Amino acid sequence: MSWELLVKQKFSAAHFLENYKGKCEKMHGHTFELEVHLRASELDNSGISIDFGLVKEYLRGLVPDHKVLNEAYGFSPSAENLARHFFHQVSEKYPVVKVVVWESEDAGAAYAEGQ
């Protein structure tokens, strides 16, 4: 028996895609949404597995709100690269199944390992 928990955190940031030809090679911004899927195999005596509030607090400390992502990171901040980056960061503290980074309500990238 297991549960998959979902926690989301929004942040606003600017970026541009390096080595890309098209409109996204220019600086632009998004209200990103970081969606983290966590695995839990048991519940505590209160009926929960992982406290959503603690996860949200942790995610707020990770996201570079109102920053230029190209300056914040040493890689081209595509949705794909951001999803992989956040997967590894969150995995240091929580049992991550997958991470999705949404650039808009209908465009995003997911990253998972071992699948």
Locate each region found by the language model:
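Charge-rich, low-complexity N-terminal segments
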Residues: 1-115
